[in-house]
């Protein structure tokens, strides 16, 4: 994706790095600082809209919880529906679920069974790509419901953690606005 380097620098510079959070040795990339900057937030959504408009998407799927913060406004600007993928027990209608591995243990995600169908071309979005486990589980849910998903967008990517390679094995085209080294 070709984008204005000044715009990308503004977005990247709006993301604060918090050392030793949530544990010693981790550099936490705090996307909430981007949300506090209306210029950076608007620019982030605008760049994603510009990249994904006119590609025939029918739904944007965002992962809990920060994926909602970028997915919902993106879907609104694209004029398509937004579908949340959530942790168990948070969605009121019938759901399907997918378990996935974390660094220490596992987690589960759910989606409404009637949220996606075989006619849907889906764009998946989350705030950050690290190991790729959350998006891998999300893509599996969408495909179980018959939806077509070949694209995933992120505000931040941490390439050292291997998520890009993991998701490319699922035939996903990935777009990240900012990359940061390390964990």
From Swiss-Prot:
Listed GO CC annotations: cytoplasm
GO molecular function: adenine binding; adenine phosphoribosyltransferase activity; AMP binding
EC number(s) reported in the record: 2.4.2.7
One Gene Ontology term from the biological process aspect of the record: AMP salvage
Catalytic activity reported: AMP + diphosphate = 5-phospho-alpha-D-ribose 1-diphosphate + adenine
Main location: cytoplasm
Keywords associated with the record: Cytoplasm, Glycosyltransferase, Purine salvage, Transferase
Record PROSITE patterns: PUR_PYR_PR_TRANSFER
Family: Belongs to the purine/pyrimidine phosphoribosyltransferase family.
Quaternary structure, from the entry: Homodimer.
Name of this chain's protein: Adenine phosphoribosyltransferase
Organism: Shewanella halifaxensis (strain HAW-EB4)
Recorded name of the encoding gene: apt
